[in-house]
């Protein structure tokens, strides 16, 4: 989630399993690109975990839940992808959604740049991704009742999109450097 103030990006929250990290916009690694009008702009570089929904500010190993890096996400520099080149834009009326008890299926509307973009995905109330793999599945393992592969998270509609802070939860530290992010824990 990007937090804007007067149209200027100020902070970014990256989801990491049950938690995540929030960084000041100025702290993030950036790459320069050009718009269709040949304007130079900067976009943040995020690292997507292999086989996971988690996002990180740096490449490498990212342990979570279990000690000694036994359960970790792995990221690397991989191919650079600019999501702005193939993205859909939307407007979300969280007040209308909240007042209807979450049943207002018109609370998400496509932007003028993509008026035919689908919206039904947003209202899906189940978990995204795989279900918890059984222990008999050769990819699955557990230690101290913590499974390596678990059922995916709920979608963006259920991520407190009407929140005042950039983080999903009240407990949040806005980080002002990548180094501070390396020292922080995943559940901050």
Go through each PLM region and give its residues.
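Domain-length functional cores that host ligand/cofactor binding and catalytic or interaction surfaces
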Residues: 1-188
């Amino acid at each position: 989630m990007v937090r804007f103030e007067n149209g200027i990006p100020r902070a970014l929250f990256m989801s990491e399993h049950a938690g995540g990290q929030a960084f000041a916009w100025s702290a993030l690694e950036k790459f320069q690109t050009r718009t269709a009008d040949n304007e130079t702009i900067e976009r943040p570089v995020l690292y997507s975990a292999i086989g996971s929904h988690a996002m990180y500010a740096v490449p490498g190993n990212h342990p979570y839940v279990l000690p000694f890096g036994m359960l970790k996400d792995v990221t690397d520099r991989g191919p650079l992808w600019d999501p702005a080149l193939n993205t859909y834009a939307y407007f979300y009326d969280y007040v209308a959604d909240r007042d209807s008890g979450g049943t207002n299926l018109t609370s998400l509307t496509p932007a003028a740049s993509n008026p035919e973009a689908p919206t039904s995905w947003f209202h899906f109330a189940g978990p995204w991704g795989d279900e918890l793999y059984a222990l008999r599945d050769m990819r699955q393992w557990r230690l101290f009742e913590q499974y390596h592969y678990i059922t995916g998270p709920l979608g963006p509609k259920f991520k407190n999109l009407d929140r005042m802070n950039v983080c999903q939860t009240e407990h949040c530290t806005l980080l002002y450097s990548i180094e501070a992010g390396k020292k922080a824990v995943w559940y901050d």
